[in-house]
Amino acid sequence: MRPLPWSPDTVPLMLAPMQGVTNRAVRQVLAQWGWPDVLFTEFMRVRPGADNSAARLSQGDLADARPHEHGVPLVAQLIGRDREVLVAAAREVQGAGAVHLNLNMGCPYGRMNVGCGGGMLERPEELPDILGSLREAITGSFSVKVRAGYADPEQVFSLLPVFEAAGVDFLVLHARTVVQRYEGHADHAITARVVQQTRIPVIANGDICTVEGGRRVLEQTRAAGLMLGRGALRDPLLFERLRGRASAAPAEGELRGTHQRFLRELAQRYGALFCGDAQVLSKLKSSLAVMDVPEDSKPYRALRKAKSVEAFCEAVEALAA
């Protein structure tokens, strides 16, 4: 097993990769004062090159191929369907600086589901070859982010021997099926059974939004760690709360101050990362949309209704007034 992207004898708390949301700016802000143990890139879409064997990755993706973000280990996530192209992409991303690589086998959305992401679970017979070839090509840690199954939540148990034989270093399990998308609830009873049945470290993912919920999942599953998504954007201090280094629940009014700081710093970074007022505003509102802020609150309504970055920033300053 290669060195994992977290310190031994710790229970790692990871920021989930969320396409269109956890971009470089979000990761940098959270790395500086949210303190996740591990960060993931948004998925890097792998397409065939001109000769159908080389990978074609965007320059933006390659710019994110680095070993860490502000000192926090960074895992580069790939999404694709063809073995040769995925292997070429893994080599290219490592050549650009990535150390830890992850294969997305869980994305449930249609355009990514044609054989990619969660769509790979419709072709389980191809997985030994794909995973084995990736393992040979990856010199650092190699992990898989996977759903419990495509339509059958028991499918993951038939995949565990495949993951073990391929030498996968750790699994991130979102305990829903692909067809569920984000409906219903993540079934962490499945996570607990997976932990019991594999020697691979398992990171629990899905519906972990509070300290109480996170601790319950750890106790129920005995997972090696947790991956936080929307919960960490709603409350960037959730990582520290889970460690017991911040209050278990935000005090009254505390979240507004946290959101103010988060959105203020994000707006500053987005100005350098994206082009033009319209794109920056769109990205800010995308972040706001996953923060699960109160819909009936006047300060948050002002953020949603802002027509310019300037108006958005003015509304940010009014949040904790």
Indicate where each model-derived feature is located:
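Alpha/beta catalytic cores of nucleotide-metabolism and tRNA/nucleoside-modifying enzymes
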Residues: 1-14, 19, 25, 129-132, ...
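Glycine-rich, positively charged N-terminal anion/phosphate-binding segment
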Residues: 2-4, 9, 18-92
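Flexible, glycine- and charge-enriched loops at secondary-structure boundaries
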Residues: 120-124, 184, 252, 256
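Glycine-rich phosphate-binding active-site loops on the catalytic face of alpha/beta enzymes
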Residues: 42-46, 101-110, 175-177, 207, ...
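Alpha/beta enzyme core
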Residues: 32, 87-101, 105-115, 125-200, ...
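Gly/Ser/Thr-rich helix-start
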Residues: 21, 81, 107, 119-120, ...
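Hydrophobic faces of well-ordered beta-strands that scaffold small-molecule active sites
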Residues: 13-16, 39-41, 74-78, 101-103, ...
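Short glycine-enriched, charge-decorated loop/helix-capping segments at active-site entrances
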Residues: 54-56, 116-121
